[in-house]
């Protein structure tokens, strides 16, 4: 029988674990090579032999008393709950600004640039994000789904609905992600490499000096189709209204005073850089909105009537007696705390200074 290089002391209690038998050769210091004596007498830890279970008490090598228990490995952490995605991830999908050099509408659901791309220019946008809650997103998605279904079903009876396709603004068409919606504070802008940094500094300074603190908006302004003269698309929008500190929406002759102030500051800065203003008219306070769907077709009377009938449907997921219109007007709102400036793919966040109660701001 071959003699093992190392034989454990009989008092160590480890013979069975090491596979030695009772009739095998006894351990003797004279039988151990010098290089192994040094290892045996040294402090080399308490590693268990490879065949030992993880929780088996193992005696330290070269010692006849005391045990050391190797604790079992901790159970792997559950991966069922994922960490929340940072809202900065949404900055990649918050704006419709595109930065590709070539314009191929077939790759973007037929959408075309309002401003043709010129190498060296930076498409830009100033806006306020709204990332709907799961309940609001489900409600709006159900509205768009119903509208798509009813338009397709009614196309045979109403010629002005033939070929009309409704596209949602709630999800990115190219990636399986929910998109945050937005309130625009500028028209589509085109900045140059030379002036983009100066524009960012100036528009940030203008927003900071506006005196506007965080405020709350809801969608009591109603729902309707909107198409601008320069656009090739029609948009289904939720009209935004600011909520006063009392919880009531503004109902005076100057709706949305805070949004109007922010827009005026952005428009002034845009004009200084030769860029077009947004809503540069007397009724700008009524025109703030969030887009939830769009179509290439012009909004016909049939499309408007179908949209109204869906919004007035009294069978929502919330109540048999509450229409979608009522739910949006009374239950959906969000707090505006940040304005974002997107230049190319870079998004800068400007936090509105919180000065306590956000009182109405006088417009100029």
Swiss-Prot record:
Entry annotated with the keyword Nuclease: yes
EC number from the UniProt entry: 4.6.1.-
Any GO BP: U6 snRNA 3'-end processing
InterPro entries: Usb1
Active site, per annotation: 182 (proton acceptor), 289 (proton donor)
Enzyme class: lyase
Domain of life according to the entry: Eukaryota
Positions bound to AMP: 182-184, 279, 281-291
Localization annotation: Nucleus
Molecular function terms from GO: 3'-5'-RNA exonuclease activity; lyase activity; poly(U)-specific exoribonuclease activity, producing 3' uridine cyclic phosphate ends
Low complexity: compositionally biased ranges: 9-29
Residue numbers binding UMP: 279, 287-291
UniProt KW keywords: Hydrolase, Lyase, Nuclease, Nucleus
Region listing for Disordered, in residue ranges: 1-120
GO cellular component: nucleus
Cited Gene3D superfamilies: Cyclic phosphodiesterase
Database matches in HAMAP family: USB1
Known function: 3'-5' RNA exonuclease that trims the 3' end of oligo(U) tracts of the pre-U6 small nuclear RNA (snRNA) molecule, leading to the formation of a U6 snRNA 3' end-terminated with a 2',3'-cyclic phosphate. Participates in the U6 snRNA 3' end processing that prevents U6 snRNA degradation.
Family in the record: Belongs to the 2H phosphoesterase superfamily. USB1 family.
Protein name (Swiss-Prot/TrEMBL): U6 snRNA phosphodiesterase 1
Organism (species): Neurospora crassa (strain ATCC 24698 / 74-OR23-1A / CBS 708.71 / DSM 1257 / FGSC 987)
């Amino acid at each position: 029988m071959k003699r093992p290089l190392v034989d454990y002391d009989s008092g160590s209690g480890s013979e069975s674990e090491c596979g030695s038998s009772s009739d095998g050769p006894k351990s003797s210091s004279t039988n151990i090579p010098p290089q192994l004596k040094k290892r045996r007498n040294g402090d080399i830890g308490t590693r268990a032999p490879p065949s030992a279970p993880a929780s088996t008490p193992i005696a330290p090598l070269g010692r006849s008393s005391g045990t050391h228990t190797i604790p079992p490995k901790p159970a792997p952490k559950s991966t069922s709950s994922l960490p929340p995605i940072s809202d900065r991830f949404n900055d990649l999908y918050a704006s419709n600004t595109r930065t590709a050099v070539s314009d191929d509408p077939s790759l973007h659901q037929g959408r075309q640039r309002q401003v043709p791309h010129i190498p060296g220019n930076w498409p830009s946008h100033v806006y306020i994000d709204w990332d709907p809650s799961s309940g609001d997103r489900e409600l709006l998605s159900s509205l768009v789904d119903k509208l798509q279904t009813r338009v397709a079903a009614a196309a045979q009876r109403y010629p002005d609905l033939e070929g009309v396709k409704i596209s949602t603004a709630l999800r990115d068409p190219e990636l399986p992600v929910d998109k945050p919606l937005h309130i625009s504070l500028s028209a589509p802008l085109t900045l140059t490499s030379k002036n983009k940094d100066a524009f960012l500094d100036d528009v940030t300074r203008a927003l900071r000096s506006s005196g506007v603190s965080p405020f709350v908006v809801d969608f009591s302004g109603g729902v309707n189709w909107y198409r601008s003269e320069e656009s090739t698309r029609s948009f289904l929008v939720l009209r935004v209204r600011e909520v006063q500190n009392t919880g009531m929406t503004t109902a005076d002759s100057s709706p949305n005073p805070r949004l109007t102030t922010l827009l005026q500051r952005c428009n002034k800065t845009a004009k200084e850089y030769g860029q077009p203003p947004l809503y540069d008219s007397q009724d700008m306070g009524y025109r703030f909105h969030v887009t939830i769907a769009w179509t290439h077709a012009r909004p016909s009377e049939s499309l408007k009537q179908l949209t109204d009938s869906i919004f007035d449907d009294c069978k929502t997921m919330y109540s048999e007696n509450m229409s979608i219109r009522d739910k949006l007007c009374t239950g959906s709102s969000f707090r505006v705390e940040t304005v974002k400036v997107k230049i190319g793919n870079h998004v800068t966040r400007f936090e509105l200074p919180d000065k306590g109660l956000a009182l109405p701001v006088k417009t100029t």
